[in-house]
Amino acid sequence: MNNIRILQGTYKIRGKDVDLSGMVFPLVEEFKVGAKGGYVTVDGKAVAGFPDRNIKIACNGAADYEDASGAQITKREETDEETIDRLRERFDMLEDMTRATKKGDVRAMIVSGPPGVGKSFGVEKVLGKHDLIAQLGDRPAKYEVVKGAMSAIGLYCKLYKFADKDNVIVFDDCDSVFADELCLNILKAALDSKKTRRIHWNTDSFKLRNEGVPDSFEFKGSAIFITNLKFDKSKGKIREHLMALESRCHYVDLTIDTEREKMLRIKQIVSDGMLSEYKFAEELHQEIIDFIDINKARLRELSLRTVLKVADLAKAFPMKWEAMAENTVMKR
């Protein structure tokens, strides 16, 4: 595949036409004219900041680009604004997908991202709003968040409890179900693409008899898995398990992989009002963010949770919160 240098051309990034003049891309297909005008097709995944697929660069003709076989592919860095917009879009999409899961349009979803960036908050916010009517009507909740370890029989019973349509089970950092083969087989049956999803427990169990759970039932609910695991980077036997589950789920990677992206996510959430309940002066808001940013390499965890810890200290110890934070949230 030859490289080409764009002499004159644009591509929409976050809804804005970005001038790509001078940038080098691998050529996929020569100039063509489509319904929206002329374009040349290049490999976007080769250049950072572009979609992981072929993209169409708008141009007027083949004269708007030239052969650049000996040139290096352009290394383009996202601006802070572009990164914040990308992350905001991802989290908005997470909320949209959660609504679709609640309605039953999406059977299952895996949400992958580092700890403390707001994965669980976005999911629970949407489900909590939908569940308000059930609470007001004194009806059983239609969703539950499961955390920690879970056995196969515990999983079977939980799925039975939320087997009805419009019910959702959220597995939040409950990664033990991914490693256990029996749990995985139960989940594969529950999330199968067939019209009828029937789950069976074929061994005698006192627990099932005691709780009135049948040895088979039809599962019509949905599931959301919130995890810190990167499925595509997993290795060994667990990779086979994760791939089997991923094939039955929509996979949402929040694309927060670097310290810079985590820090920009923190700045975005704070600017959106995360600390408003503390009623701090705007100057103190900025001091807290600056403290996190300056010391990010030494923090025990760069996350929204750490921001809240520092805010708690600023409220409790207005005159010495920085000294307190240095001793509680930073590595020694």
Task: Annotate the PLM regions.
Residues 70-104:
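N-terminal pre-Walker A segment at the start of P-loop NTPase domains
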Residues 179-219, 226-228:
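Conserved catalytic/switch belt of AAA+ P-loop NTPases
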Residues 1-75:
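N-terminal accessory interaction module
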Residues 139-141, 165-167, 193-194, 219-222, ...:
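Short glycine-/polar-rich loops that comprise or flank the Walker A/P-loop
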Residues 129-167, 175-180:
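AAA+/P-loop NTPase substrate/partner-engagement loops
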Residues 236-257:
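A short helix-turn-beta junction within AAA+ P-loop NTPase domains corresponding to the substrate/partner-engaging
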Residues 103-123:
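Walker A/P-loop nucleotide-binding motif
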Residues 263, 270-330:
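Conserved AAA+ ATPase small/helical "lid" subdomain
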